[in-house]
Amino acid sequence: MHKVVLISLRGYREWTESLGPRREHIIQKVQARIHGALWSSFTAVGALPHHFRYDYLIALANNVPRHWIDTAVAKIRRSSPVEVDYCIGMGETPLDAYRSCGEHKEGKESNAVVAHVDIVNSTDATRINGPIHTYLRALDMLRTAAGACEDVGCIAFYLGGDNMVVYLPEPKAIYALLDRVEAPVRAGVGVSPRPYTAFVKATKGLDALRAENKTGVKVVR
């Protein structure tokens, strides 16, 4: 089974509104601070985090003990202007785990499976068409992947540039996902007991495809 941690910043909207209309520069600085705390605290315990609304944060946490998760969340609390709550979900897929958050399901935790995906030749496309063109292509890829994840049971996030990260239920799930993506892509897929190690392996696979100037998928176990 896969394990997901869902973190919520309680009262975040009310806090932002309390700052008055000249507030966005403050909000952005605080969001950056929380984002940094999220990544440093959760990767330190082997989990793979991301934000998908700045008042909600998520982490793939297969095989990460509960007390380590408590420690990671405590570090986020120290960076947050509001109370921080979290729940843990377990499921046969990462998406199932997210949807069951707080239901106290139990089971043997599987290896984490993570994909690191990018669009081929985006550097040249950016040089010719400009960065907004590449950014919109990346968002199209993410939107397509997110739709496919409803069927596959995965969760996809934008990483920046032309990259996305995907929490996968199993390695072969990447093929069902990429079948729907129109742009030529490379995907490294990492498999490991701990999610951040799986992501590191996925990046190694992606780097190998780039070095060989190949498209497709490379799985690293």
UniProtKB/Swiss-Prot annotation:
InterPro entries in UniProt: GTP_CycHdrlase_3, Nucleotide_cyclase
Record-level GO BP terms: biosynthetic process
Catalytic activity: GTP + 3 H2O = 2-amino-5-formylamino-6-(5-phospho-D-ribosylamino)pyrimidin-4(3H)-one + 2 phosphate + 2 H(+)
Top-rank taxon: Archaea
UniProt EC number: 3.5.4.29
Keywords: GTP-binding, Hydrolase, Nucleotide-binding
Similarity-based family: Belongs to the archaeal-type GTP cyclohydrolase family.
Function: Catalyzes the formation of 2-amino-5-formylamino-6-ribofuranosylamino-4(3H)-pyrimidinone ribonucleotide monophosphate and inorganic phosphate from GTP. Also has an independent pyrophosphate phosphohydrolase activity.
Protein name: GTP cyclohydrolase III
Species: Pyrobaculum arsenaticum (strain DSM 13514 / JCM 11321 / PZ6)
Lineage: Archaea, Thermoproteota, Thermoprotei, Thermoproteales, Thermoproteaceae
